Amino acid sequence: MSIFTKIKKSLKSENLVNYNKFIKNLEFDEKNSTSTHLIIKAPNIFIANFVKRKYLNKISELYEKETGIKPKIDIVTKEISHRPLTIEEIIEPTTPSVLIPEYTFESFIVGPSNQFAYTAAKSVAENPGKNYNPLFIYGGVGLGKTHLLQAIGNYLKSSLNVLYVTSEQFMNEFTENIRMKTPERFHEKYRNCDVLLIDDVQFFAGKERTQEEFFHTFNELYNQKKQICLTADRPPKKLYDLVDRLRSRFEAGLIVDIQPPELETKIEIIRKKCELNGIYLPEEIIEYIATKLDSNIREIEGMITKINAMSKILGISEITLDFAKQALKEHIKDKKEVITLEDIIKLIAKEFNIKPSEIVSKSRNKNIVAARRCAIYLAREFTKESTPIIAKYFGLRDHSAVSHAIKSFNKKLKEDSEFRIKIEELKNKIQIKKSE
């Protein structure tokens, strides 16, 4: 096995998705390389740039570990490794449609938490542009949104012109074409596809020119009855920094969510991942992983890989529960719960005996106003959201209204000792949730 093959194998064990997207098709240029100067060929400029940014140091470290030599590394494109890039070559590969073959409907584990999203995605794939257009899938990180989006693409790619990109890729390519004064090239690519799949549209937030361009792209495709599928980490109504007319387009189709998988679904996911990767884990270890680890499927995959890799490195032929606990000890110990605005709203609604929807309403009822101010105060203290985002979430005019609410709340804290004790109890509950 060559050194470069070993390096690729090591990178594959760390992140299978990125390996399939960016590392798998890299080639080592033996003819032009030396022991101190490595030339690696990438299929296109996009992959070359990604590998330079994300993997150059790692490849260098792995090579030095194998040989004892710290190399100089050049990442070039296969077809243009010995000549300058033309404008066309720079622009065209900037946003490749990378569909991962493994992401199919057959490999997607269905459970109560994702049944509706799965059924909707399958229906769209079977009747593109007819049933649900656009299809908007939202949910937390690592729950399967990208898998379903790509499953649609893989189902249709043999018969239709399918274009899959992330919102960041869309934005980067749009910006590059504007800079190069070639907007027609961008329009030709994005407005002539049959199926447009865009991942993580929440990253369009605040990018006004990109939103404007996507609005026109959306309309052009929609009017031609072309299928549009989108994913985000939240529903359209909570994409606060999107222009209203774009948000309304998203809301006009079918909106489905994916919830964190319940225990039984997590167990099935772990079994499937082990089967696909040729890894055997006893049932008690599978159940341990399912109960102890986050519902983030990517994290679960990473832990399976870690247990398997550690067992091979240490020469352990039979993986026991004690070994699995030891392998995952640091990860489980360091896990922290992320507190969201929704968590704050639910907690305050329960404490004040009102509905969550009343907290974000315009009601001036004294009890609801007090609950709202309390929620705003705790949101500012315990979530990562900015003041403008908090303002929009609670339906306030702007960030100054948040400051006013917090000021009023602090005044009550100083004046009312009983109220202060109650708030400290709420803070303790949130701290406990964070450390779980």
Swiss-Prot record:
GO BP terms: DNA replication initiation; regulation of DNA replication
GO cellular component, one term: plasma membrane
Domain II: annotated segments: 69-97
Location of region: Domain I, interacts with DnaA modulators: 1-69
Keyword Membrane among record annotations: no
Keywords: ATP-binding, Cytoplasm, DNA replication, DNA-binding, Lipid-binding, Nucleotide-binding
Gene Ontology molecular function: ATP binding; ATP hydrolysis activity; DNA replication origin binding; lipid binding
Binding site for ATP: 142, 144-146
Domain IV, binds dsDNA: region residues: 312-436
Cited InterPro entries: AAA+_ATPase (IPR003593), Chromosome_initiator_DnaA (IPR001957), Chromosome_initiator_DnaA-like (IPR020591), DnaA_C (IPR013159), DnaA_dom (IPR013317), DnaA_N_dom (IPR024633), DnaA_N_sf (IPR038454), P-loop_NTPase (IPR027417)
Domain notes: Domain I is involved in oligomerization and binding regulators, domain II is flexibile and of varying length in different bacteria, domain III forms the AAA+ region, while domain IV binds dsDNA.
Complex formation: Oligomerizes as a right-handed, spiral filament on DNA at oriC.
Similarity comment: family membership: Belongs to the DnaA family.
HAMAP family reported for this sequence: DnaA_bact
NCBIfam families per the UniProt record, alphabetical: DnaA
Protein name stated in the entry: Chromosomal replication initiator protein DnaA
